[in-house]
């Protein structure tokens, strides 16, 4: 009769040790993979939101100075809002104590009625040197950096008198409007996102603007993203 052979205690301990080490390595790999996946998901979330934001701003800026041809309109009010004889319809500035070029103000004919504003009577938007179009605030736009957040101009709040004359109408595009309290609202959720840079730079001959945008997640400041976009201004003269 042959004697039975089995594992020695040392061999058993070695096997158990190797198994435990393997399980530990698998657990560490799984945890690391989960962490990397979470980082990737959060990075993509930030990237998607900032890309959506810069595309939104760019889409608005492409329309700067647009005015539709309205054959029924006797006289429009664009000249009351334009900053010079070239028809300049945009200002780049900054709020007090904010980074340079972090505020942009502009207008365009959103509803394509030929005027800045929605309603007018007798087929004219002016009465002498005064504006008579209503709801002009709906076609006066703006974006700015305020602290760690992008703000957009509230188009339902009137910061310019509806019966404005040229100087008052043009105040919608002056630096003081970048400071106006109560006329701006957050564009993003401040609990989720923080913006570190919003900048608007003129391109050569004023025929375009480069937007620079950078930010991070509020809860994960190490997850960052930056992007830029060049926007042609097709409705502005040189």
Positions of PLM-derived features:
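Short linear sequence signals and composition-biased patches located at protein termini or domain-edge surfaces
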Residues: 163-238
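Aliphatic-rich helix starts adjacent to a transmembrane/signal segment
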Residues: 3-68
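N-terminal pilin/flagellin-like segments and related low-complexity appendage regions
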Residues: 41, 59-187
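Generic cytosolic/nucleocytoplasmic N-terminal low-complexity/intrinsically disordered segments
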Residues: 1-4, 143
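Acidic surface patches and DE-rich sequence motifs
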Residues: 3, 84, 217
């Amino acid at each position: 009769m042959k004697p039975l052979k089995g594992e020695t205690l040392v061999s058993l301990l070695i096997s158990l040790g190797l198994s435990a080490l393997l399980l530990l390595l698998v657990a560490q790999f799984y945890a690391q993979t989960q962490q990397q996946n979470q980082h990737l998901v959060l990075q993509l979330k930030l990237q998607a939101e900032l890309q959506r934001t810069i595309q939104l701003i760019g889409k608005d800026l492409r329309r700067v100075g647009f005015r539709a041809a309205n054959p029924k309109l006797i006289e429009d009010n664009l000249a009351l809002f334009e900053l010079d004889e070239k028809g300049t319809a945009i200002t780049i500035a900054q709020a007090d104590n904010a980074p340079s070029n972090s505020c942009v103000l502009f207008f365009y004919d959103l509803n394509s009625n030929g005027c800045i504003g929605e309603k007018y009577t007798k087929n004219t938007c002016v009465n002498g040197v005064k504006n008579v179009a209503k709801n002009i605030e709906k076609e006066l736009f703006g974006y700015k950096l305020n602290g760690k957040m992008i703000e957009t101009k509230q188009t339902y709040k009137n910061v310019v008198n509806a019966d404005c004359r040229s100087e008052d109408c043009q105040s919608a595009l002056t630096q003081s409007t970048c400071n106006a309290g109560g006329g701006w609202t957050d564009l993003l959720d401040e609990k989720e996102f923080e913006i570190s840079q919003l900048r608007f730079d003129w391109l050569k001959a004023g025929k375009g603007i480069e937007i620079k945008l950078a930010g991070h997640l509020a809860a994960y400041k190490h997850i960052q993203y930056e992007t830029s976009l060049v926007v042609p201004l097709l409705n502005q003269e040189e």
